[in-house]
């Protein structure tokens, strides 16, 4: 096993080199001016016309031979410079850093129902083999396998935010809404009195003693957590049920 893993690890640099080289050559088929657009984050930077464009092409090395550009890209990659993200309007590293806390928070809260519910319902389903609860959980796992995540997310948003919350606004105020916080909570978090210790809103709200903000953040996490965890929960439940049936 160790020898197999070692061989695979030896091939990893070759695979990475080949994959990045192919993608780089594909991008090279674009016009240099089209590739230059990735380096421009403000149209005012191009007021100089074609002369300014040519100057920027030389500045970023886009007129160099492809192998020189690739070597420069690898050198920047090795130094931690992953380039500019047009989507994030910042460096790639900056975009990752800005979005990582929200991603980590969502992953942490999604992990709990995946493990807890899958183990509990897997055991319950196996103990009640071919009974109603077993058939119900099997239907849930089939739905979890077959339903795309983006479809589930849109359906939950339509049902709970579009119907339930709008029908009972006083009962579900701040729940099921898109985003990470309500407007009032976002203003409080952006204030100078609120200290961002970790970037995780639930943790930071608790550390700041802002329990209303914590409750609001949890209410906004419900639908994303269900959407993210359902497919993994269904897969783990199925494995747990099969293992328990073999044991019993």
Model-derived features with residue positions:
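Juxtamembrane loop-helix boundary motifs flanking transmembrane segments in multi-pass membrane proteins
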Residues: 1, 48, 62, 66, ...
């Amino acid at each position: 096993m160790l020898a197999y893993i070692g061989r695979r690890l030896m091939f990893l640099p070759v695979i990475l080199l080949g994959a990045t080289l192919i993608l780089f050559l594909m991008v090279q088929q674009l016009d240099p001016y089209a590739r230059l657009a990735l380096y421009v984050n403000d149209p005012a930077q191009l007021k100089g016309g074609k002369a300014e464009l040519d100057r920027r092409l030389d500045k970023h090395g886009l007129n160099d031979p492809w192998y020189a550009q690739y070597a420069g890209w690898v050198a920047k990659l090795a130094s931690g410079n992953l380039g500019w993200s047009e989507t994030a309007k910042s460096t790639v590293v900056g975009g990752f850093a800005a979005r990582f806390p929200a991603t980590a928070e969502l992953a942490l809260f999604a992990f709990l129902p995946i493990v807890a519910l899958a183990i509990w319902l897997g055991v319950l389903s196996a103990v009640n083999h071919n009974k109603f609860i077993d058939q119900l959980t099997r239907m849930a796992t089939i739905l979890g396998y077959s339903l795309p995540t983006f479809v589930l997310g849109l359906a939950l948003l339509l049902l709970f935010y579009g119907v339930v919350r709008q029908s009972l606004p006083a009962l579900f105020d701040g729940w099921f809404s898109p985003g990470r916080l309500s407007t009032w909570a976002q203003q409080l978090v952006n204030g100078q009195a609120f200290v961002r210790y970790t970037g995780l809103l639930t943790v930071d709200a608790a550390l700041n003693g802002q329990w209303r903000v914590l409750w609001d953040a949890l209410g906004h996490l419900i639908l994303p957590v269900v959407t993210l965890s359902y497919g993994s929960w269904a897969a783990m439940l199925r494995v747990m049920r099969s293992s328990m049936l073999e044991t019993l």
